[in-house]
Amino acid sequence: MNCQKLIVAIVSLFIISFINAQEKKDAKKWNVNNPEGPYKEVSFIVNEGTWMNVDVSPDGKEIVFDLLGDIYSIPVAGGEAKLLHGGHAFEVQPRFSPDGMKILFTSDAGGGDNIWVMNRDGSEAKQITKESFRLLNNGVWSPDGEYIIARKHFTSTRSLGAGEMWLYHTGGGDGLQ
């Protein structure tokens, strides 16, 4: 009798696990750049910010920075900030390439925090890393501009997180630890 109860319990757990896996498989993937519900855009003007990342171009003429999840540039001499890359995705940590022609940044546009690269003027943004679970951030260029080193974030129940340094070619790929 106890053996029958054990078999019924095991079969029940298997069925529940299978149904749960099917529900997760059929769940619609959320796209940060295509919100499903209604939303309203709000315009505002700021003259200061906090928790910003700032980088100066190698030629010393331009500053790139993030503010509220968008990336801007401004001349070092002052003037109006220009939006380089913005939208629904949260984009931060811009860094000029050694030759000043490209800017890398962290974006959640692909569903998780990954490293992206765009031209200095904000055009032709391209996702470099394709991480779907571990978050990538704090990207920096190699001196020759061919590689990017970024921190891959790991979390556990015992800590707030730890990181590993990963090397990626600017053409993409899996990267090396």
Describe each region flagged by the PLM.
Residues 61-63, 81, 91:
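Post-signal-peptide, soluble extracytosolic/periplasmic N-terminal scaffold domains
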Residues 22-26, 47-48, 66-72, 85-92, ...:
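A flexible loop/linker signature enriched in serine peptidases of the S9 family
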Residues 76:
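Short, conserved catalytic or interaction motifs in soluble domains
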Residues 1-24:
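Bacterial Sec-dependent N-terminal signal peptides
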Residues 22-43, 61:
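Blade/loop signatures of beta-propeller domains
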Residues 37-39, 79, 123, 173:
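Residue-level signal for pocket-adjacent positions within structured domains
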Residues 55-61, 94-102, 139-147:
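Blade-terminus and WD-like Trp-Asp/Gly-His loop motifs, strongest in beta-propeller folds
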Residues 39-72:
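Beta-strand-rich domains and repeat architectures in extracellular enzymes and scaffolds
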